Amino acid sequence: MRLESAQELKQRLLTDIIIPLAAHATRVRVAGARAVATAAVAGAEPLTVFGVGARPFDKVPQIQRSVALGVARHQGEYRLAVRVQRPALLHSPMLEHVRLQAKGEVEIRVVGRIDKRATRVRAATAATAHAATPWYQRDMRPLLIGASVGHYKVTAGTTGAFVKRGTRTYLLSNNHVLANEDNAKTGDWILQRAAYDGGKQPAERVARLRYWVRLKKTSANSVDCALGEILEGIPCDASLLRGIVAGADRHLAGVGPGFLDVGATVYKIGRTTGVTEGRVTAFDLDNVVVNYDVGNLRFDGQVEIEGIGTHSFSDGGDSGSLIVDGDIQAVALLFAGGDTGASNGLGLTFANPIHPVLKSLKATLLS
């Protein structure tokens, strides 16, 4: 189908089916939790209410994982991208209705749970415990794209890029890396390397938190981003992408086009997996529900990427990585991923398109 047709179909199905059903599921779970609380006051056993083991009201996620919809391609034709976040929905009447409405022009993948990518930083195994620490997990002066960074209370994330806002220079990464999911305050210290990688205060202080886009808990987000103002005397190299293509250094060539099509080859440098190559598998994905410490959050307008070969494109700790295209232009900011859904049997990565990121922060990319 044509691109416009795929986008129109996606929006209609989201509005008429997916979002209303997800909202209904949330209301049912909240109602069940309230019933549990009421039953507890009355001395009843929680498991007898509604025949299910509803959870306490304050622990019910406000947004439920269901199905994300976007745009994919098959043999040159656009089609509806269907991303199932709860495997139990794979054979549901809802999904069958989506198939029928799309007249079979769908690409369905079970992606399961999606997490922010600053979590699950894995401890070294016996095989890697004595390996040399890679450069992107060490102190880097000048500051480099791809290096370990984080709010002093956050485990570890990645330095995405460097930007200008007014006359000041800032470090770009995710909200959940620099602003601790809105739990930080303006002026908080940013460390490079991050605390998980041994960053200490005051030695590794490189920036102060200045600007971030707050995360919405009950409506759709489009970005997860924040800026740290780089301290006087801390140098940065705003263009070097160390070993980004086939082990060779390249230099960032500015901001890429707003449209990132399926099949495009992309690269990133991240704190955990270093340099990886991937391909875009879907774009304009809406209703992507991501697990954060503050609960499940919904994102619209996202890009989906899978790793090329036998590796995932990202892992926990790669949050905030700048994603560049084949022309080494910035196209997206990595923020989330899962363990399933890619054609190589591994997980998928999700990213904010770079244009909304820069616009929301009123920033200009340095290169």
Report the location of each language-model feature.
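Protease-domain processing segments flanking chymotrypsin-fold serine proteases, especially trypsin-like
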Residues: 5-166, 170, 183-217, 231
